Amino acid sequence: MSTALATLAGKLAERVGMDSVDPLELITTLRQTAFKGDASDAQFIALLIVANQYGLNPWTKEIYAFPDKQNGIVPVVGVDGWSRIINENQQFDGMDFEQDNESCTCRIYRKDRNHPICVTEWMDECRREPFKTREGREITGPWQSHPKRMLRHKAMIQCARLAFGFAGIYDKDEAERIVENTAYTAERQP
């Protein structure tokens, strides 16, 4: 284990009140929970840097990692993690949503601004198709079971990026698209 990895893990453990736990045990547990598959020390360090930067807890899945195709990682922040970093921002002054079957608009209010930051996300641009197994079987995901909730999450995350300048972190859907390296083109609506 590298010194940088031990230092970052210790800093994170201290922040979440786990500094009395053996650092090696913490790192072992994190390797098993915050990564899909094996992780190198470099990938692990990258995740811990982002977790510490945004004050996110990888033990509670506020942040975890998807390995990319170039042996790096894509830092994935869960909805609870996004909610934490939004609510902990000192300038945050509330948010609201307007939603119908086609779109969701999120407004985030900042204490230091006169006007809210508004973002609209569209169902036809964000929705994902069911996953297909190698055998061709369809597996439905959250976009099929809870499409409006997923769209609301997308609108909140994109609005938070504009309102607070969050960069280098992604939601699970974005991470999957990055790793798949696929672009999605929405169908034109009449």
Predicted regions and their residues:
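Glycine-rich anion-binding surface patch
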Residues: 1-190
